[in-house]
Amino acid sequence: MEKQIKIALAGNPNCGKTTLFNALTGSNQFVGNWPGVTVEKKEGKLKKHDDVVIMDLPGIYSLSPYTLEEVVARNYLITERPDAILNIIDGTNLERNLYLTTQLTELGIPVVIAINMMDIVRKNGDEINVKELSRELGCEIIEISALKGDGVMDAAEAAIRAAKGTKTVPMHTFSGPVEHAIAHIEEAAVHNMPEEQQRWYAIKIFERDDKVLEKLSIPTETMNHIEEDIKAAETELDDDAESIITNERYIYIAQIIKG
């Protein structure tokens, strides 16, 4: 029997994620709660594909550990490591939705993007250069209308292809000072991890993410060296590390949307 393929469905609240999940799985769903929390956990088998399980993650705006939903989604992605992520984004609100995308592509898990509500985008007379966006983000993009069911199986098939494809290595999208610090952190603290996971952890260490620092328990001496690197970037860019990452994500998104 073929190995089961796990695909995580991720996106902002109200982007059409639940509609897409229902379209992909039909009545073939299991609903429960995530361990230890009251956040609803939904998974289902892809229609006509018994070997493909779709996990509907809670709607989130980012992978920061600030809300229960974010913690649940993030824990699933970094500990369970699904075979692919199907990231549904609302085409009418591209900039805000891509903020999560930039974080998902750092996980070293293959990502496929489903741009939802493309019918409305066109109706509004707007245009999205899907080909250019796909090239910039390094992942396949499928246009869908979750409500009408257009393109939904194409999106699932693309996610299956991505899951069976080669390993993905995250792209470098930050400014020189940040990338310099991240490279040092990778070398100093996370070089023993699988290559595709190193960058995400290094970025989180740069942001001084409490949950990651707690999990990794980096030796004090190493952490002192890392702090020097972080502070150097903060001084050069005149902001705190977490704000620097946030701002640079939005700068990157603005650049790729302009195409």
Model-derived features: where do they sit?
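Conserved G1/Walker A P-loop phosphate-binding module
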Residues: 1-66, 79-80
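Residue-level signature of catalytic and energy-coupling elements of molecular machines
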Residues: 20-21, 39, 54-56, 73, ...
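Conserved nucleotide-binding/hydrolysis micro-motifs of P-loop NTPases
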Residues: 27, 36, 59-60, 91-95, ...
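Alpha-helix N-cap/helix-start motif
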Residues: 32, 66, 97, 123-126, ...
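Conserved C-terminal guanine-recognition region of P-loop GTPase G domains, centered on the G4
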Residues: 46-49, 72-141
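Conserved donor sugar-nucleotide recognition element shared by glycan-biosynthetic enzymes
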Residues: 69
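Alpha-helical transmembrane helix bundles of large polytopic membrane transport and channel proteins
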Residues: 112, 122-259
